[in-house]
Amino acid sequence: MNPADSDHPQLPNIKIHHPPSPRHSHHHHSSSTPSSAATPTPTAGARRKIGVAVDLSEESSFAVRWAVDHYIRPGDAVVLLHVSPTSVLFGADWGPLPLKTQIEDPNAQPQPSQEDFDAFTSTKVADLAKPLKELGFPYKIHIVKDHDMRERLCLEIERLGLSAVIMGSRGFGAEKKRGSDGKLGSVSDYCVHHCVCPVVVVRYPDDRDGPVPIVTVKSGGDDDGDVVAASASAHHEHIKDE
């Protein structure tokens, strides 16, 4: 599928950055850090910039739809933020692909190239953006690469100046139970306690929860009380900002 098709955003709205991994304090900004304000973007001039962190999963798709239905308001702009790991190729459809597979099994199918994975990632994130496009919300797609997904996500959220960030998860710690380091779960837990802006975690409803999603809201930050008012139909868990 071509991300440039009419059902997807134009390619200039999709940027995959390959910057060196920042190993510095959240309060230190390097002059070499690329600026999202260098050129006009679809989010310029928005009253609020709402981030939705996505990992190409069904949970992320649900989080985007929830944000459209319950959180995003006229005048807002949305940034779909994806951090792609550098050490392992990971995709919702491909699954984790350790680099040692071909060494262990010479008969294994050739692994996708980095270019293939970049194209796959851009297409999948563009698919996630469809609800935003359908309702006319301005948005852009921001993709970066780093081996430390949790820290990089928090750094990008701060650098982009987001008013709030929404992400999907089946529950904190779900990632650890599955033994994967690529999906939101403990990532969302880390963001709840380290991001500089309010964080809303929408847990994909399962058989235990019933049809109503569980929404976890990080306390702190000034976000006009939007979370409580907008998602009154969902069960809430509140976490104090440490």
UniProtKB/Swiss-Prot annotation:
Transit peptide start-stop: 1-43
Main localisation: plastid
GO biological process: response to molecule of fungal origin
UniProt modification remark: Phosphorylated by MAPK3 and MAPK6 after pathogenic elicitation (e.g. bacterial flg22, Phytophthora infestans zoospores and xylanase).
UniProt key word Transit peptide: yes
InterPro entries registered for this protein in UniProt: PHOS32/34, Rossmann-like_a/b/a_fold, Universal_stress_UspA, UspA
Record PTM Phosphoserine, positions in chain: 21, 219
Subcellular location: Plastid, Chloroplast
Binding-site residues for ATP, renumbered to this chain: 19, 83, 168-178, 186-188
Annotated Low complexity bias: 31-44
Taxonomy, superkingdom: Eukaryota
Region (Disordered) location: 1-45
Record-level GO cellular component terms: chloroplast; plastid
Keywords: ATP-binding, Chloroplast, Nucleotide-binding, Phosphoprotein, Plastid, Transit peptide
GO molecular function: ATP binding
Miscellaneous information on this protein: Can bind nickel.
UniProt similarity note: Belongs to the universal stress protein A family.
PANTHER family, alphabetized: OS01G0783500 PROTEIN, UNIVERSAL STRESS PROTEIN PHOS32
Name listed for the protein in its UniProt record: Universal stress protein PHOS32
Gene: PHOS32
